[in-house]
């Protein structure tokens, strides 16, 4: 056997955008704690992480049960930087989505971690189906939130008001719709934390200027074959509904 890998360190911004006139930096970096899990949709995580990497005085901690490679839906793995036991308290709690998120709705350790982090976090953030984890932990009850359009309606079963918008802010919660909306959410958060000018500079550095070949990225505008698109996710949505129902029963029983 070869030597054991070193424990990775949290990721700090390596090329941050400075805030003009922001004054003295805080005593410690802003802490963003992200939850990683098997079969995470990689762009849900990596898109916002790219924005976070350019925010000034910011640390990104990536948590999972163990420090070991975690497979994504993209065919590659990501190595967490910390465990649920060792993660620091977050200023921003961030949950990406993916099919693996629904498996975590029944993971008591993960839900307890989210509640513990939420007790002190100023921002509760999610992308895509990551909002279901926040909801299952009781952190979105009575609030507006969004998710991927294919699962959005299921949020209501967890006491959430489903809202079909790209980014939804309600109190401490800021949720993004499906997958690519994560970049929009992260830029909005950057603007809230560091000012609009700083967020615009990050957007320019990333050359985030979407110009898709088709206007088919939202159900309200798409001229794609809606029946086929819905049929392809119908079976998955039915299974997800069963998991959400069990999570709702536990939430309401508590």
Regions inferred by a protein language model and the residue ranges of each:
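Residues at secondary-structure transition points
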Residues: 105-108, 146, 177
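Structural detector of well-ordered beta-strand residues that form the stable sheet scaffold
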Residues: 124-125, 146, 163, 174
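Short pre-catalytic strand/loop immediately N-terminal to key active-site residues, enriched for Gly-Thr
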Residues: 119, 169-174
């Amino acid at each position: 056997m070869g030597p054991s890998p070193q424990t990775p360190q949290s990721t700090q911004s390596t090329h941050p955008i400075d805030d003009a006139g922001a004054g003295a930096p805080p005593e410690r970096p802003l802490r963003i704690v992200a939850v990683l899990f098997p079969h995470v949709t990689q762009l849900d995580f990596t898109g916002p992480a790219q924005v976070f990497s350019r925010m000034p005085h910011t640390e990104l901690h990536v948590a999972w049960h163990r420090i070991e490679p975690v497979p994504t839906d993209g065919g590659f793995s990501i190595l967490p930087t910390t465990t649920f036991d060792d993660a620091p308290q977050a200023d921003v709690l961030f949950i990406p989505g993916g099919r693996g998120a629904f498996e975590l709705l029944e993971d008591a350790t993960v839900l307890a971690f989210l509640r513990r982090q939420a007790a002190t976090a100023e921002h509760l953030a999610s992308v895509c189906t990551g909002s279901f984890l926040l909801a299952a932990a009781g952190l979105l009850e009575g609030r507006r939130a969004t998710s991927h359009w294919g699962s959005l309606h299921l949020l209501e079963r967890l006491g959430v008001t489903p809202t079909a918008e790209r980014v939804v802010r309600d109190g401490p919660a800021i949720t993004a719709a499906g997958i690519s909306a994560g970049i929009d959410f992260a830029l909005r958060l950057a603007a809230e934390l560091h000012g609009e000018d700083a967020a615009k500079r990050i957007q320019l550095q990333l050359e985030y200027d979407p110009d898709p070949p088709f206007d088919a990225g939202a159900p309200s505008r798409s001229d794609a074959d809606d029946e086929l698109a819905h049929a392809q996710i119908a079976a998955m949505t039915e299974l997800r509904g069963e998991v959400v129902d069990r999570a709702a029963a536990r939430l309401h029983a508590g």
